């Protein structure tokens, strides 16, 4: 029998069919393999000695990584911490270059913590614009926030030469201890929210002292460490008091109409957060479960939130109670400033922070 003809090959002298396409493929494969081996050898043969060329970080990459941070940092905030640093420098007399480094460190830590807070609270607005993770996504926002924490530590090394030769202060431990406190406070705040556990006022104040007071203490402790003065009074009780005033004030304003533009309408209720007025209201009448059930629902509608604010205002008088607590704490802070020798800049900050009577948030939003 004759071999069948093929359109793709020839019949050799032995009558066997020879597939030219297979021969061509084999030849191409061999050639390709040779080229690949040449390219790999050429590219990676001396790779060990070229590794240092990979150890570069282009400025363009840095800008990409920091874009979520830059987005929020470029939106004006309250700047209370920066103002506090300047005010305390009336007493501590830190040289301006070191003071600016401290401001930068505290600013980095503060903005990074806000990036994380907004993710953890699933917020919509921050400073009147969409929160960072709604634009850049949660993974990139978290990574950037963590990166900025380490940038702050990098800045910290610039303060080491500013310490006096006999100073034994460990700046890294100082900052680390306060960041631990900050995360402890934040952790309890999140636990109460997610487990629907209403803390006592005392537990709430302890949480705030850890969480909000942490960045204030970092600033003042760094300033004390770098102060040229041989002796300084104990400023930390005042610093802690200011942190608590700041947070309770923030809690009150969140339920006020003046806060709606920047943070949204009664956002603490939507987050299910146990703020100072909410804690008081729940504890004031434990037989009434309306407010707890509203927090459980994490309402987004204006009607439910307006009802909750009216309940706190009219039934448990919690807004008035919060205002009276703030007034009491502000008076103590002013007395402490006077005892420490007076400080016009701090007194101006207290005047700025004082909450005047304002209408609670209503459904006329």
UniProtKB/Swiss-Prot annotation:
Sites binding Mg(2+) 3 sit at: 250
Site-annotated residues for Important for determining product chain length: 149
SUPFAM superfamilies listed in its UniProt record: Terpenoid synthases (SSF48576)
What does the record note about the cofactor?
Binds 2 Mg(2+) ions per subunit.
Its taxonomic path starts at:
Eukaryota, Fungi, Dikarya, Basidiomycota, Pucciniomycotina
Region of interest: Disordered: 1-36
EC code: 2.5.1.-, 2.5.1.1, 2.5.1.29, 2.5.1.10
Q: What name is this protein filed under?
A: Geranylgeranyl pyrophosphate synthase
Organism field: Melampsora lini
* UniProt-annotated binding residues for Mg(2+) 2: 117, 121
Q: What does this protein do?
A: Geranylgeranyl pyrophosphate synthase that catalyzes the trans-addition of the three molecules of IPP onto DMAPP to form geranylgeranyl pyrophosphate. Does not show any monoterpene nor sesquiterpene synthase activity.
- Asked whether the keyword Transferase is assigned, the reply is yes
Q: Which keywords describe this protein according to UniProt?
A: Isoprene biosynthesis, Lyase, Magnesium, Metal-binding, Multifunctional enzyme, Transferase
Q: Which PROSITE patterns match?
A: POLYPRENYL_SYNTHASE_1 (PS00723), POLYPRENYL_SYNTHASE_2 (PS00444)
**Required co-factor?**
Mg(2+)
């Amino acid at each position: 029998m004759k071999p069948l003809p093929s359109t793709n090959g020839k019949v050799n002298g032995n009558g066997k069919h020879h597939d030219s396409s297979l021969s061509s493929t084999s030849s191409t494969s061999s050639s390709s393999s040779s080229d690949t081996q040449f390219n790999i050898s050429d590219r990676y043969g001396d790779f060990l000695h070229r590794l240092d060329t990979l150890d570069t970080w282009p400025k363009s990459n840095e800008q990409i990584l920091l874009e979520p941070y830059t987005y929020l940092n470029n939106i004006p905030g309250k700047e209370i911490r920066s103002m506090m640093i300047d005010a305390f420098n009336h007493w501590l007399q830190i040289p301006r270059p070191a003071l600016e480094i401290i401001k930068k460190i505290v600013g980095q830590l503060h903005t990074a913590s806000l990036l994380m807070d907004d993710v953890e609270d699933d917020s919509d607005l921050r400073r009147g614009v969409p929160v960072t993770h709604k634009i850049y996504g949660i993974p990139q926002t978290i990574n950037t926030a963590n990166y900025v924490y380490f940038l702050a530590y990098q800045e910290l090394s610039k303060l080491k030469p500013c310490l006096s030769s006999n100073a034994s202060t460990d700046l890294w431990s100082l900052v680390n201890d306060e960041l631990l406190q900050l995360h402890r406070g934040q952790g309890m705040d999140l636990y109460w929210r997610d487990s629907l556990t209403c803390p006592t006022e005392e537990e709430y104040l302890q949480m705030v002292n850890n969480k909000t007071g942490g960045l204030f203490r970092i600033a003042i402790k760094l300033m004390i460490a770098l102060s040229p003065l041989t002796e300084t009074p104990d400023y930390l009780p005042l610093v802690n008091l200011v942190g608590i005033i700041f947070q309770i004030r923030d809690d009150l304003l969140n339920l006020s109409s003046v806060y709606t533009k920047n943070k949204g309408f009664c956002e603490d209720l939507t987050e299910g957060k146990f703020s100072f007025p909410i804690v008081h209201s729940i504890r004031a009448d434990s037989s009434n479960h309306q407010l707890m059930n509203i927090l459980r629902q994490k309402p987004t509608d204006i009607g439910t939130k307006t009802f909750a604010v009216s309940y706190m205002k009219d039934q448990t008088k919690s807004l008035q109670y919060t205002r009276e607590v703030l007034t009491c704490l502000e008076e103590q802070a002013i007395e402490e400033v006077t005892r420490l020798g007076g400080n016009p800049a701090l007194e101006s900050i207290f005047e700025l922070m004082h909450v005047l009577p304002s209408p609670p948030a209503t459904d006329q939003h």
